[in-house]
A protein has these predicted regions:
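Short, low-complexity cationic-aromatic patches
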Residues: 37-45, 57, 75-79, 92
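Acidic, glycine/proline-rich low-complexity segments that act as flexible tails and inter-domain linkers
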Residues: 1-42, 70, 96-128
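Alpha-helical transition-metal enzyme core signature, strongest for iron centers
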Residues: 54, 88-91
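Substrate/cofactor-recognition hotspot
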Residues: 84, 91-95
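Short, structured motif recognition centered on aromatic/hydrophobic residues
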Residues: 44-52, 81-82
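Mid-chain, well-packed structural core segment of small domains
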Residues: 54-79
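A short, ordered amphipathic alpha-helix with a cationic face
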Residues: 19-20, 52-56
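Buried hydrophobic packing segments
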Residues: 50-51, 64, 85, 101
């Protein structure tokens, strides 16, 4: 779900204080809930991102924005999800998520392309 890089990082950060908690997360969240039949991982990713956006859980949101591509989520899926969440979670939360998504895209080498002059003109006309 989160990819081998995240798993490796989690294992490297285990210590005598957090090991039981990390084990619980691995067994319950990933082993039980995320592995259940009945809802595709693509959908689980989108639902999770929407909830984290609404709750303002930025660290977890960044992690799931990176990981969602492992579950078949696309940039267009995220764009529509964030736009939709702006109605129910508020514009500030959605705006923060939009910026986080753009940062994640840049880190993954899939940064959005700038609009052409023609596209910019069309956008301006649409706003008038």
């Amino acid at each position: 779900m989160l990819g081998e890089k995240h798993v490796g990082s989690s294992l490297e950060n285990l210590n005598d204080f957090n090991a039981d908690f990390q084990n619980f997360i691995s067994r319950f969240a990933w082993g039980e809930v995320w592995s259940r039949p009945g809802m595709p991982r693509h959908t689980r990713s989108l639902v999770t991102i929407a909830m984290l956006l609404a709750l303002g859980r930025e660290d977890e949101l960044r992690m799931h924005l990176r990981a969602c591509f492992n579950n078949g989520v696309t940039k267009d899926d995220l764009k529509e999800l964030i736009l939709h969440c702006s109605l129910y979670a508020g514009l500030p939360a959605a705006n923060a998520a939009m910026h986080m998504a753009e940062e994640v895209f840049a880190n993954l080498g899939i940064a959005p392309q700038k609009l052409s002059e023609q596209q910019l003109s069309q956008e301006q006309m649409n706003q008038e």
